């Protein structure tokens, strides 16, 4: 369950950033996660609910996830195509020589905070 490590790292970054910004609380965090990261959404949500309570800044913070589906480019014919996690062969020329263009993201896109000011 690598979601625990992912959430732990995300919360550390969020809390550090929120403190530097003078936040009184974190309202919402938006993540972008590619399907190729093999993150289980239910496990991510569970870890978030548990670990966000460790700091008063994130006690009520909502987590939103934007999924990124994999897309690859064929290095033989140049075709760009969407696929699932397991089938990366080019649909145009059937080559297995492809490059993953997106789908491995694991990014904090934004966070909404409140300040006492």
Task: Spell out what each predicted region is.
Residues 2-15, 38-41, 53, 57-64, ...:
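Extended interfacial segments that mediate partner engagement and assembly in macromolecular machines
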Residues 20-70, 79:
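A broadly conserved sequence feature marking short terminus-proximal activation segments
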Residues 68-69, 84-85, 103:
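Flanking scaffold residues of small Cys/His-coordinated metal-binding clusters
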Residues 72, 88, 106:
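Cys/His-enriched microdomains
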Residues 74-77, 90-93:
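Short cysteine-rich clusters marking metal-coordination/redox-active sites
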Residues 82, 95-99:
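Short functional micro-motifs and their immediate structural scaffolds
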């Amino acid at each position: 369950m690598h979601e625990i490590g992912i959430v732990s790292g995300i919360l550390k970054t969020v809390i550090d950033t929120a403190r530097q910004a003078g936040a009184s609380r974190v309202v919402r965090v938006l993540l972008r996660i590619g399907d190729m990261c093999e993150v289980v959404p239910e496990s991510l949500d569970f870890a978030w609910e548990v670990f966000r309570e460790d700091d008063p800044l994130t006690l009520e913070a909502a987590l939103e996830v934007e999924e990124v589906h994999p897309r690859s480019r064929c290095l033989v014919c140049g075709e760009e195509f969407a696929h699932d996690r397991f089938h990366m062969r080019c649909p145009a020329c059937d080559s297995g020589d492809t490059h993953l263009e997106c789908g491995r993201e694991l990014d904090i896109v934004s966070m909404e905070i409140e300040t006492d000011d």
